[in-house]
Amino acid sequence: MENFEDYMLDVMNKAAIALMLSVGHRTKLFDSMYDCTSMTSEQLAAKSNLNERYVREWLGAVVTGKIVDYNPSNKTYSLSEEKAKLLSRGGSYNFASSMQWISALAYVEDEIVKCFEKGGGVPYESYHRFHEVMADESAQTVLPALVNDILPLVPNLVERLKKGIRVLDVGCGSGGALNLMAKNFPNSQFTGYDFSKQAIEYATIESEKLGNKNTSFQKQDVEHFPENETFDLVTAFDAIHDQAAPAKVLDNIRRAIKDDGIFLMQDIGSSSQLENNKTHPLGPFLYTISCLHCMTVSLALDGHGLGAMWGKEKAIEMLNEAGFSEVDVKQLPHDPINYYYIAK
């Protein structure tokens, strides 16, 4: 490793850059720079309808952070085409959007510190903008690939969806995945469960905007499924490891699936063993989001505290214990962060 003091300075600078990238996303400054035109701070502020003094100081951070280029001869700023594609809504993946996680997680730092001292957890309602940030992330990773890449991982599933089956999404959040499936497969019926009233309300509104007539969103604790519900397909996108009682939830899912049904689970692509994650390209980030959200929201409900980094080995073990005798694990080239489990 390089000199540790230099490493720490680099960490501090990159943490600051991450915050400014988030600000650049939320203020749409990067979108204003997407065409790579050189602008003064006054021109950029006017184009973005923002306060020039704040824009100028933000530019100071992203120039010294080697994000934005600066020409001192005419005091203009520009974003290269390569960087514009990775930092704006017009690109294939918006890293600036993902930086919102840093401030969203830091919001509960005081409560997390108390948990270190006294135990317990931080409840969902303590988080600021969490569902919004999660929806943004899902819109980049899950939604663009859902119909053409993720669903076809299951043999004959797309054909069955076209004909008409019953689908349940566990921990549906803001309903992005379910609403997209409902829009593409109008002959199938889609139900979404989440215990967040705010998320269910948002999902319902979005469904109405899309004109979906085949969706039902319900505020439901997935530890307690309605006894009479049976589904051909159950999905869970980045949801199982947050549960207070994940083993019970998996048991309920198995019971709710028809004999010829499928459980499709997307979850973090990691090992259950720390030593195997030391070279994971997002290891520090994923353990951090687990500690500051996934694990603690479970512990807040007196839960198991499984955490985001429960790993493939533990996931397969728990799926087997829930009664899924066949578990196939897939990865997609566009998504190095997640595993896709096909269980029956």
PLM regions and their residue ranges:
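Short amphipathic alpha-helical interface segments
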Residues: L21-M39
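Conserved Class I S-adenosyl-L-methionine-dependent methyltransferase catalytic core
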Residues: D10-A15, V23-G24, S32, A61-I165
